[in-house]
Amino acid sequence: MEGLINGSVYYKIFDKTFNNSSHRYIKKNNSINETEIVENKKSITTYFKAQDILILNQVHGNQIVNADESIIAVPEADGSITTKKNLILAVQSADCVPVLLASGDGKIIGAAHAGWKGSINNIISNIVTKITEKGAKNLIAVIGPAIAQSSYEVDDEYYKAFLSKDINNKQFFIHSIKENHYMFDLPAFVELKLKEAGVKDIKNIAEDTYTNPLKYPSKRRSYHLQEPYNQNILSAIVMK
């Protein structure tokens, strides 16, 4: 457990080295049973000595859930914010960029799943706006482990989509050895979006999920190796 704001806000990246979980947190198919999910969530709440945990049904979008409001079903969203103590906010990832946020006074927290679709469609500015509207100031952010530029090859259509949003996005791409393909720096893009939104205090873990198979699940690595993709990193934050 890392102290983001000692005495009030803590976070942890639950990777493969955390042995008290099978690293499955949402039931998306019949290969995952409900008991397994319940036990995995319980292991996280026990670790933090917290009361509850909110894990979203992520859809690679830009919607943010206010977890202060009553939530009955698992929300379809890619970010959450709260002022509640002992409520863990968590996002799953396996190459996409997890972002954890806290106000400088330790009274508001947030978590976002920033894949390329969510990132290009302003999920970072959305969550910063939402958390600021609740009174957060002097935001602190953690960028969790994600796929690095050296591991992330994309095609020309993807490249053009980013440049159509802003020609300056060209800085995040370098040519691949494969014709009409590029290597994209998604974590750097997310970091810039945090800075543009006014976040100055940013901790970037800067570890490549693709090249660390013993520590991190990677959807792209699993695809390339023709292996099942059935685990996720869980990036979690809580106020005490």
Swiss-Prot record:
Question: Does this UniProt record's set of keywords contain Zinc?
Answer: yes
Q: Which cofactor does it need?
A: Cu(2+); Zn(2+)
Superkingdom per UniProt: Bacteria
Origin organism of this chain?
Rickettsia conorii (strain ATCC VR-613 / Malish 7)
**InterPro entries assigned to the protein according to its UniProt record, in alphabetical order:** Cu_polyphenol_OxRdtase (IPR003730), Cu_polyphenol_OxRdtase_sf (IPR038371), Cytotoxic_necrot_fac-like_cat (IPR011324)
On whether Zinc is a keyword of this UniProt record, the answer is yes
The UniProt subunit note reads as follows: Homodimer.
What is this protein's function per UniProt? Purine nucleoside enzyme that catalyzes the phosphorolysis of adenosine and inosine nucleosides, yielding D-ribose 1-phosphate and the respective free bases, adenine and hypoxanthine. Also catalyzes the phosphorolysis of S-methyl-5'-thioadenosine into adenine and S-methyl-5-thio-alpha-D-ribose 1-phosphate. Also has adenosine deaminase activity.
Q: What EC identifiers does the entry list?
A: 2.4.2.1, 3.5.4.4, 2.4.2.28
> Which molecular function terms from Gene Ontology are attached?
adenosine deaminase activity; copper ion binding; oxidoreductase activity; S-methyl-5-thioadenosine phosphorylase activity
Which sites bind Zn(2+)? Answer: 60, 96, 113
Q: Which reaction does it catalyse?
A: adenosine + phosphate = alpha-D-ribose 1-phosphate + adenine; S-methyl-5'-thioadenosine + phosphate = 5-(methylsulfanyl)-alpha-D-ribose 1-phosphate + adenine; inosine + phosphate = alpha-D-ribose 1-phosphate + hypoxanthine; adenosine + H2O + H(+) = inosine + NH4(+)
Q: What protein name is recorded for this chain?
A: Purine nucleoside phosphorylase RC0672
Q: Which UniProt keywords apply?
A: Copper, Hydrolase, Metal-binding, Oxidoreductase, Transferase, Zinc
Q: Which family does it belong to?
A: Belongs to the purine nucleoside phosphorylase YfiH/LACC1 family.
